[in-house]
């Protein structure tokens, strides 16, 4: 293909993402676009086509970004090449959204005609505005009885500050307004820039491991051209490879002769070493390299840490390999090896939030056939020691002795909660119960309020989101950012079973709530841990002080069942023998701890009261 044809092709490319709050209809809209552009036949059509993981379909959420090439015959008679990148909407996966947007020139903003602008809508659209993307607003679900498109149009203009006069009125489910949207994409979103003659510069925005092809890199070509047979260099690691295949997803992989500036596609180069590739890296030509790499992505720091252990210690290496492969496909995941007296060898993993942790655990179990135990998630604490040194503690079991600690600082978040007027009281009560400090309250219109609180991250990570939804009948929406560290009066609570400390059950709590939490957890463990043949004392301690104790009663086998009549000394002898046996068992007995016990540490009775 000559240069003029390539330049003409570049002018017909449109790269865009779809961004929205959870459940506003992104994936359904993507389905309709694929259908209308004949990218996928009616026979192959299924709901959430771009959500390729079973897990995404089951939960009805998008977890991974997904890029696909479509061809659209516009009303001006020209054929345009669309690269559509579907993105997640949940706060835990904001990182996936920011990576998708870096590969685009425009963003389609989907807002539910009944729900209006919500917290994640704002968070995601601001990411797009920061990247200078052209925004095409779509008001979706206009066929719902509760739809108020004009009110939502005004919200988009007032809350986000973008012109919504031409906003597309659509119903992705019914297929209304999809053609208008495609025409707006053609006319509003600019074609990509990029010099075809310059040295190759391609940004890696995702990668996945394929057993046959090695690492498959998802790239946005910013400058130059790449073809099979080219020698490429990954600028971050300096490793060089020969390209075996380039292509696009449509939505299945289609090999191409080349990828050029403006294209979004994939490159394979028989990369077997997972450590060589990193999301945010720049791919260039080894013989004619670019001088400077592209600006990558800011590294995401994990918010939540938890231990993941194989139930069978022999599977430790399998777990390491599985985590390495997942890290390719999920750049925000962090892990390092650790050991626990109770659970053996495993990994301390860092996640962006609880949903992220849940998804990783489920993917490890499904995709790699592993049986795992996950400990209760915790956050990173900054501990200042009496000798002046600082220590970061990600695992409560590693918290130093209280006598050696000067102060403990915990991470706080700035939580923005958008809520209807009627539920402001319920939200404020919940935030205060979670040790939140009130910051500001802003009335967005006559019915909606944006409440801002500073809340310890440890109080948010477990069930704050669920509580918020149930206390406001699902109307409130939440977005939060890390807001530095603050000193708090915190203590470590250890759990002892049968006199032995179970390091994986240790947790950190505020001193004021520690005795109550200790009692609740001891009582909870009593119901969760199965009864044994001997009595098990369950104790919660702070240092050497026991703050709660309960006993798990033993099973009792009737050893005298076969006796009838006769001398009672025979009966007493058998009962004494049983007692001695139980005593011996108690001395050497190991207590089996089920998975629910680790999560019980986080749930408190106060949380479980019906709202």
UniProtKB/Swiss-Prot annotation:
The keyword Protein biosynthesis applies. InterPro entries: EF-4, EFG_III/V, EFG_V-like, EFTu-like_2, G_TR_CS, LepA_C_sf, LepA_CTD, LepA_IV. Keywords: Cell membrane, GTP-binding, Hydrolase, Membrane, Nucleotide-binding, Protein biosynthesis. It is an enzyme of class 3 (hydrolase). One of its GO terms (biological process) is positive regulation of translation. Its EC number is 3.6.5.n1. SUPFAM superfamilies: EF-G C-terminal domain-like, P-loop containing nucleoside triphosphate hydrolases. Residues 11-193 form the tr-type G domain. GO terms for cellular component: plasma membrane. Coiled coil: none annotated. Signal peptide: none annotated. It catalyses: GTP + H2O = GDP + phosphate + H(+). GO terms for molecular function: GTP binding; GTPase activity; ribosome binding; translation elongation factor activity. It is found in: Cell membrane. It is a peripheral membrane protein. GTP binds at residues 23-28, 140-143. It comes from the Bacteria. Required for accurate and efficient protein synthesis under certain stress conditions. May act as a fidelity factor of the translation reaction, by catalyzing a one-codon backward translocation of tRNAs on improperly translocated ribosomes. Back-translocation proceeds from a post-translocation (POST) complex to a pre-translocation (PRE) complex, thus giving elongation factor G a second chance to translocate the tRNAs correctly. Binds to ribosomes in a GTP-dependent manner. Belongs to the TRAFAC class translation factor GTPase superfamily. Classic translation factor GTPase family. LepA subfamily. PANTHER family: TRANSLATION FACTOR GUF1 HOMOLOG, CHLOROPLASTIC, TRANSLATION FACTOR GUF1-RELATED. This is Elongation factor 4 1. It comes from Lactiplantibacillus plantarum (strain ATCC BAA-793 / NCIMB 8826 / WCFS1). The lineage of its organism: Bacteria, Bacillati, Bacillota, Bacilli, Lactobacillales.
